[in-house]
Amino acid sequence: MPQTTDKNKTLLKSRIFLPIIFISAFFFLGWGYIGHRIINYRTILSALPEMEFFNTWADSLEAHASDADQRKSWDPDEGPKHYIDIDNYPEFIATGTINQNFDSLVAIHGYSFVMDQGILPWAILKTADSIEAAFEINDMHKAMLLAADLGHYIADSHQPLHITRNYNGQYTNQTGVHSRYESNLIGNFQSQIIYDGDSLQYIANLSDFVFNMIYENYQYVDSVLYADSVAEAYAGNHNSYTYYNKFWEIARNFTIGLFQKASYRITCVIYTEWINAGGSTNDISENKNYLPSGFNLFQNYPNPFNPSTTIQFQIPNSSFVNLKVYDVLGNEVATLVNEEKMKGEYEVEF
């Protein structure tokens, strides 16, 4: 059994429930070098036709996807831009949020503390501002290089182990999980990481957008650790095909979902900065409730939960939806949805 920390004790004391959804429809339905290339390249899936420059960017965004990682070898200021140990902030543990203003946060905790925890959200915001400035002077090459960096940072924010103090499983007796998840697992199963783009949204408040996606993605920290723990117990090791196959079996759905959201959100930020620099807003709607292009069942949040949790799902066609909750022993706990649903995005509370 893994050694327990305060955070892990909360996990062990909570019952873990697994939402399972059955669909009857007309149709049946941090990422390392490889992961960053996939995420950056697939930003084009959500691009609008009028953004012609994006057609020439896709290969370059992929090629430069890891430039930011390479800079860490010679730029001492680069490293903290790739992570935030957000659960080292007492207010995050208490409220689920932190102060978004960097100077205000420094005034509360001190500069050294804030830098030690990482500055990922502010790296995203600063890079986005720089992209807008490049668009304003029509320096498209610089905008592309900055967009590649933006993609890297946003992708890091969708790698759960980049946004926690337990980034390498060192507090849960799972040392090495970081590379096992973002590099080895993704490398072994990259051919199965398939997803579509979606309708763009203009981002009215970029700071809220960036911090909210980090808060949202934090819920998957325990999901990654759980998948690693179960896979190791199943295989008796953490370096065999059996281990990685079980790891992927558990982590596949939420991992592909994180990839899809990362690519989509990168494109939304780039489009927002292009619009802010004077581009057209045709066909882009602010905070649009888009219709999904594929079926998705997202990780419930919070997880672990007490006393309630929220489960989100998307369906691409009018379907009969049966959503049930099971405990880890396979016992049915509750039926949350059992009815016809129109195409769209839904959430239910349990």
Model feature map: region roles:
Residues 281-288:
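Short, compositionally biased serine/threonine- and acidic-rich segments at solvent-exposed termini, linkers
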Residues 155-169:
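Catalytic Zn2+-binding segment of zinc metalloproteases
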Residues 1-12:
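N-terminal secretory signal peptides that target proteins for export/translocation
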Residues 18-27:
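Bacterial N-terminal signal peptides
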Residues 288-350:
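C-terminal outer-membrane/trafficking sorting elements
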Residues 29-149, 165-275:
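N-terminal, motif-rich segments that launch catalysis or mediate targeting to/interaction with membranes
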